[in-house]
Structure formats: C-alpha cells, structure tokens
C-alpha cells in the first residue's frame, strides 16, 4: 500500500488525515494595500494553470477548489474503497480555537494543507502531522458579522504561483506568500462600503487572474464579479450581474439589454441582488468564466 495517502477531512475542531510533509517558514502578519512589497521567488505552493488542468496526474494533491477547473470534486484515488474503508482511523486532529462553523475546502499542495476558519483566518499546516506552519488573521471588524446572512464563515483559499489568496468577510482580497504567510498585497473589492456586502466564497485563479464575487443579496446589494491581476492586485475587469439605475449610463451593452427585462418598481434602490457568492468556474479550453448568481432583490413574492 502506498503510505502517502490516508484521507482529508476538516471538522469543527479541525480534524484531518492525509499525505506528505514539507518545511516552510514562520508566521508573519503585515498590512497594507496593493502592491506593498516585491515578493521573493516562491518555493511553496507552486501551482499554475498546467498543474490544475493535469490534476489527475497527481491525485495525492487537491490543487484547487473542487480539485480541478471542472470542479468535479472527485478524487481518482483508489486505496480507499469498500474493502479498506473499515481500516481508516484518525491520524491527527487540530483544535482551531473557534466555536463558529468551518466550511472551507482544504487545498493540498505537495504536503501542505491550506484552509480557512471563521473570520477569514488562513492556516497552512503540515498535512502529515497537523503542525501549524503559519497562520494569518485579516482582523475583520467584529461588527461586520451583522451583514453575514449565515455566520462568519469562509469557504477557503486559492493557491497559485507561490501565493495564497483569500477573500475576507469585510470585502478585501488578500494575497499571501504561500511559504511564510506574509501579506503581499490587499485590495478593497467593494463598490460601496455602506451596503451590506460580504465575502464568504473562495477565490478562483486562472490565466494569471484572481476572480472573486460577494454575498449580501438578502440585504439589498448589487452583485458583480471582479478579476484582479494575480501578481499585482490591480483590477483587470468587473462584471455586474444585474442592471443598475436605468437613468445612469450602463456599464456594458449586456446591462442595457438586461434592464429592458426588469419591470415594475425601482429595483436599483435595493441593489437588485444576483450576487456571485461562490460559484465561479473557469473553462481553460475556451478561456471562459461561468458564474452562478444568487437571489434577486427585492425578493419575489
């Protein structure tokens, strides 16, 4: 039996079982806005588009949300089956020091597991032992919890070319060094901080860009997805999912067309909804992004 594999799982206390090990640096926490420093040549978290496309060639890793660009969430590993599942046991567990929900999908890269806990905190741990290699706390203001529909959760990170990307509950996108947890840059993704936007979804990375949406359609916001340059944090484009005030210039021909189908009432005063709170999938064959939107607002009666 290949002893490199057990299985993965993260519960409320952070239970996990898995793979290989690797040495990385210590925790460093900084703050700033993009760009804040020139990053050294990365040695950890060396994921690129080619590795994610060929994810089946390294089944012992879980390189992206959903495992691959298709987000199939299926492991091709065969060691755990009907005959062997009864032999599984707990390899290690980790108390994450919170009584709030954990909803992150761990990303596993060459023996290091990257995941988030409540309040958008990020951890890198040795996947074999559970030892914390570094952690990062974005220090989300506690009052932001009032905007979170479904607890102060976070669904995980993206790892790409030596960096770890996380969206914070209060609407920031942050890039960290995958080896040390040092902050490289952060940007404010929110178009209006007086509106109850949140981020609980995991970023997606592809083709040199980081893609992030947001939540809050229940409370009256307007949904959109933004692409940022993965290296610098500079905004590349933004796409709104619902039309805004028809008395103002439209952001795109698509929004002008969509506005013709929105009838009755002044929906733009309550945002319009349509937030992309987690469903973002990249198709490398066509270089297209597919997104799923949440409820409209005001809610239909």
Residue ranges and their predicted role:
Residues 6-19:
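Core hydrophobic alpha-helical membrane-spanning segments
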Residues 126-129, 139, 177-180, 229-232:
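Short loop/turn segments that connect beta-strands within beta-propeller blades
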Residues 18-29:
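Hydrophobic single-pass membrane-insertion segments
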Residues 62-66, 101-121, 146-172, 198-222, ...:
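Repeat-blade elements of multi-bladed beta-propeller folds
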Residues 115, 122, 127-132, 136:
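Active-site cofactor/substrate anionic-group-binding motifs, chiefly glycine-
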Residues 32-96, 131-146, 182-191, 234-242, ...:
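Aromatic (tryptophan-biased) beta-strands that constitute blades/sheets of beta-rich domains
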Residues 1-4:
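Positively charged n-region of N-terminal signal peptides that target proteins for export
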